[in-house]
Amino acid sequence: LPDMPPQIPLNQYGLGSSPDGAKVRAAYPSFFTDPFAGQAALAFLLFKYRVSVSVTMGPDFNVVLGGPTLIANPPLAFDFSHNDHRAAQAFMWARMLNTIDTLIDLLKSEPFDAATGESMWDRTMIYIATDFGRSRTRLSATGAFGTGHDLNNGFVMISPMLKGNTVLGGVDPQTFRIEMDAVRATKR
């Protein structure tokens, strides 16, 4: 950050801008007004300067205005509770993945070990999870899915250290058949 008295008097506290300030501001131009972008920017700096080997980031429950859709963060973070939660989750997954994609680009640009040529990204694993899912079925002739809590939440692990195209866990054929029967029944 530049020294912006009286809002942020860095000089007053013996502080100055980071040498990586311009790079981080270019990657996350809304870092100062968007808490999630700010967390990602800080995560990069914590990793780069090896202050931390692990960080936790997440959207908050406050509305953040801005971005191409005018709302950068809706209330209730990943879930609009009993109001169009599928659209809210699609919006939030896009938000999370775009922010994390930028973080990955920053980590790829930073060397980890000059001898091996590894970047910071080569030694990073990202785990994204929602706290729960919503009902998976939709009643016939309705435009909305159910709002009941379900265990069908989603998570994503991203890392060059992981074997891709792998399902962790499995599918219970009996549960799957029941789900498919319910779906077929609604089509009649």
What are these regions (language model features)?
Residues 1-115:
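Anion-binding catalytic surfaces of enzymes that hydrolyze or transfer phosphate/sulfate esters
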